């Protein structure tokens, strides 16, 4: 048995957040039988956890008292190959009819995985690494069920195109099968020595199964499906159990399995690359949609800004018109101010001239007052002299008085 763990299968889970029902992986071979992964997106017992289990694919085909002792573990990865979670290793557990499944009921909290793959298109991969340590083969009773199945197939679906059969070494085969059956007996003459059934219909159907197995294994590995390979394995086991000596065909099956694994690995790689390309294309498509949305928002914003700019230009034009009117008013007031200032200067000049004239008149009046006072003094002295004179002096006095009166009248005219 193997001593090294090997990656036996990669199961891709898509739209994880929407999944609730259990998912079974395709079967894969290891340790002489097929296995499959059973994945519970919402847990086998608790909705808050993921559950992962490993089971034999068809335990009834393994016979009675079969056993497989195996170690295995699971790895969860995102689409980029980054490890999200690795389970502990389950070691030395026996799988048998009483224990058909082993695994992890609480592999990982569901919410934790959802958070990790939120930005990874809601998908991830599950890998299983297995090492079968010990195999206990089961034994089979006469496979009546398989024989009955062949009989039913023969009775329910008879070949209408060929009715003629040819006997080759006790097997009645169709004429189209003669060449192939002859070659088998030529290369392996003891192939049917231990075949136990005497029913000719059953023998014919078993030979048809053998030819179908050989035909399938003759295909190119990349054109064989996993289901076909699994069927070949089961049918080869059944043929061996009813007495066909097929060690040479088992060796050929091992070669086909190796070639199939290689082709499948290459195919998985291509599939992963195709998935990656699809993911990238989806991402580009999503980004394009997002970009179109942003472009629409940006266009709307530009239009809004253009409308605002247009409104501001209109408002600016109005303000300019108002400013032009205010400027005209200012210039008019400035001209009026200048005119008034000139008029004021003129009036000030006139006022200065009048003040000078008044001052001159005041000075003349002052002089007249002084002269009048002097005259009064003179008159007082004259009066005293007149009193001492005789009437013969009246004429002189009259003459002097007349002169004073004339001067007074002259001053009055000036005033």
From Swiss-Prot:
Residues 6-130 form the MATH domain. Signal peptide: none annotated. It comes from the Eukaryota. InterPro entries: MATH-CC_domain_protein (IPR050804), MATH/TRAF_dom (IPR002083), TRAF-like (IPR008974). Gene3D superfamilies: Apoptosis, Tumor Necrosis Factor Receptor Associated Protein 2, Chain A. Transmembrane segments: none annotated. Residues 244-341 form a coiled coil. The keyword Ribosomal protein does not apply. Keywords: Coiled coil. SUPFAM superfamilies: TRAF domain-like (SSF49599). PANTHER family: MATH DOMAIN-CONTAINING PROTEIN (PTHR46236:SF12), TRAF-LIKE SUPERFAMILY PROTEIN (PTHR46236). This is MATH domain and coiled-coil domain-containing protein At2g42465. It comes from Arabidopsis thaliana.
């Amino acid at each position: 048995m193997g001593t090294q763990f090997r990656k036996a299968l990669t199961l891709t889970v898509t739209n994880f957040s929407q999944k609730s029902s259990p998912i079974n992986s395709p079967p894969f071979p290891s340790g002489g039988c097929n296995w499959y992964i059973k994945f519970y997106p919402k847990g086998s017992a608790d909705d808050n956890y993921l559950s992962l289990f490993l089971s034999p694919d068809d335990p009834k085909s393994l016979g009675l008292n079969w056993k497989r002792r195996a170690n295995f573990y699971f790895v969860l990865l995102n689409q980029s190959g980054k490890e999200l979670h690795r389970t502990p290793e389950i070691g030395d557990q026996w799988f048998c009819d009483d224990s058909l499944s082993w695994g992890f009921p609480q592999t990982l909290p569901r919410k934790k995985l959802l958070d990790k793959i939120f930005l990874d298109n809601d998908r991830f991969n599950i890998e299983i690494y297995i090492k079968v340590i010990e195999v206990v083969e089961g034994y089979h009773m006469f496979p009546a069920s398989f024989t009955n199945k062949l009989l039913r197939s023969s009775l329910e679906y008879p070949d209408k195109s060929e009715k003629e059969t040819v006997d080759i070494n006790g097997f009645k085969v169709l004429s189209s099968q003669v060449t192939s059956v002859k070659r088998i007996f030529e290369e392996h003459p003891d192939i049917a020595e231990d075949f136990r059934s005497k029913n000719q219909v059953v023998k014919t159907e078993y030979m048809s199964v053998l030819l179908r197995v050989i035909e399938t294994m003759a295909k190119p590995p990349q054109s064989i499906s996993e289901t076909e390979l699994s069927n070949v394995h089961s049918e080869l086991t059944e043929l061996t159990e009813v007495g066909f000596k097929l060690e040479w065909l088992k060796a050929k099956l091992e070669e086909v399995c190796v070639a199939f694994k290689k082709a499948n690995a290459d195919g998985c790689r291509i599939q992963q690359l195709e998935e990656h390309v699809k993911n990238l294309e989806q991402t580009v498509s999503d980004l394009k949609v997002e970009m179109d949305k942003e472009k629409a928002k940006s266009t709307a914003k530009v239009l809004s800004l253009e409308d605002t700019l247009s409104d501001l230009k209109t408002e600016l034009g109005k303000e300019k018109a108002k400013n032009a009117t205010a400027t005209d008013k200012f210039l008019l007031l400035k001209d009026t101010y200048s005119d008034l200032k000139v008029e004021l200067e003129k009036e000030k000049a006139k006022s200065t001239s009048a003040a000078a004239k008044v001052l001159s008149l005041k000075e003349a009046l002052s002089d007249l007052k002084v002269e009048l006072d002097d005259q009064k003094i003179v008159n007082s002295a004259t009066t005293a002299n007149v009193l001492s004179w005789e009437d013969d002096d009246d004429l002189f006095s009259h003459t002097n008085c007349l002169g004073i009166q004339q001067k007074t009248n002259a001053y009055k005219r000036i005033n």
